[in-house]
C-alpha cells in the first residue's frame, strides 16, 4: 500500500544541509500519495521561510507531483471527515485533514514528524521516518 507523505518530508528533501534530507529524498523518490494541502503548505513554507523564488517552488512541486503515486484532492468529504477526526481524536484540524486525505487515498501509513509516532487512526498508522536523524 502506498504511504502518504506529509509536508515536512517535502521540506526536508529541499534542505540539503539538514541531516533529514537524505531520508526525505529517499521517501520522495520511492513515491507516495500527497494531497493538495501538502502542495499548498510546501509552497507557503518554501516562499515564506526558505525564501525560494516562485520558479524554484514550481519546479519542486512539478517534481513532487511526478513522483507521487497520487495527489488527493480536498473535497467536502475530506473536510467533513477531518472535523470528526479533530473532534474525536483531539488533533489539530490541519493534521486531521492529512489523516482524512490519507484514508481517502487508501493509504495505511502517514510519514510525518508532526504527529505521534505509532498513533493509529483505524487502519492508518503515523510513522516518523526521521526519529533516528533528528538534530
Protein language model annotation of sequence segments:
Residues 70-113:
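Active-site neighborhoods of divalent-metal-dependent phosphate/nucleic-acid chemistry enzymes
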Residues 99-135:
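Acidic, PIN/NYN-like endoribonuclease modules and their adjacent C-terminal/linker elements
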Residues 1-35, 49-59, 133:
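Short, well-structured N-terminal submotif of metal-dependent ribonuclease cores
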Residues 6-8, 41, 95, 114:
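Acidic active-site catalytic centers that drive phospho-/nucleotidyl reactions
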Residues 41-69:
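Active-site-proximal, substrate-binding regions of enzyme catalytic domains
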Residues 30-31, 67, 89:
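Structured helix-beta-strand junction loops
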